[in-house]
Amino acid sequence: KTINETYTLPTGKRSEYVNKANERTFVYRNAAGQLLKIVCRAYDDGVAFRYELGNQEPVTIRHELTECTLAGETHTWMMDWIKDYENFYPERVLDTITRPAEFLFPVLTLQDKQWMLMTEAEVYSMPAMHLSKEPKSATFHNVYAHEDSAFVAEPSFKTSWKTFIMGRNIGDVVESSLVENLNPSTDFSDTDWIKPGVAAFPWWGNYLANSYIDTLKMYVDLAAEMNWEWLEFDVSLINTPFHSSKEWEDVTWIPELTAYAKEKNILVYGWDEIKVLDNKAGRDFVFDRYKEMGLDGIKIDYIDSDSKYAMMFRDTACAEAAKRKMMVSFHGETLPRGH
């Protein structure tokens, strides 16, 4: 099967994307007649594969036995597991890592002047994958996120794409759009309202700046002077440096601030956390109230998870925000896999 299509995105690396690949599917059945397909794609800049089950009923998946073995002298840049992905990518030679460890995607490798980035794409109805490795071993094992040692796979289940981006230089990896190409198209045809950009972030310099409209207006002025696009709140939207507060609901000057920002072509992100937004009623209230106040985006915090629930929440929150033409910024967040 040949794939050859073009598409556009509201933002990204290029004005037009080309998705061109050769695809082949290998079909297997076990003695019980259960079906397994392995779908493989070859691109100019990498390869990817996924598993597809022929299950007609929900099934529980407990393990995945996928492994990837590299040369022991391979140089790697990868993050040790941490729930909020706020860590570093130290350079390490693969077979010199002397302790058992779990790592997060993406994993960048260099061996024999060949660069490769290992990651995954299209993760919507399953937990994200991590990698585990034994001491001095050059073999990675795919493991599911900690919260989902077992999860329920819906009928006709498809895994994420196991993705390998390759190039002779690091620029080939950086410029690749393989993850985008492996994802399905959006359900939204109207994307003209999407305005990505740089944000002024008052909390970084003054974690109580959110309490004072005059201070926030100065940050709006800064954003306008710097030709940035956004002002972004952080913990909390109003009046406390800690977790979510309901006080913002009664603050009268938020519409004045957003109107002032719009006069200078600056849009404003609000802030809240998953414990408020993990149900539709909570999202409906916050999203609709934000729009009434003139806020054009929301920063969603403290997801801290790669579970199936967390991956599906991100997709749901983005879809519901998009219906209101509202941007979403996730904080302490997993890597981009396509949502």
What residue spans do the PLM features occupy?
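Conserved aromatic-histidine-acidic binding/catalytic patches
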Residues: 39, 207-211, 245
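Short loop/turn segments at secondary-structure transitions that flank enzyme active sites
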Residues: 57, 74, 169, 206, ...
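N-terminal accessory beta-strand-rich subdomains and adjacent acidic, glycine-rich linkers
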Residues: 1-182
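Short, flexible loop/turn elements at secondary-structure junctions
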Residues: 30, 42-44, 72, 167, ...
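An acidic-aromatic substrate-binding cleft motif
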Residues: 157-230
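Generic recognition of flexible, low-complexity loop/linker segments
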Residues: 37, 149-152, 219, 257, ...
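Aromatic- and carboxylate-enriched substrate-binding clefts and catalytic-loop regions
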Residues: 235-339
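Long, contiguous hydrophobic alpha-helical segments, chiefly transmembrane helices and signal peptides
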Residues: 47-49, 68-70, 161-165, 198-203, ...
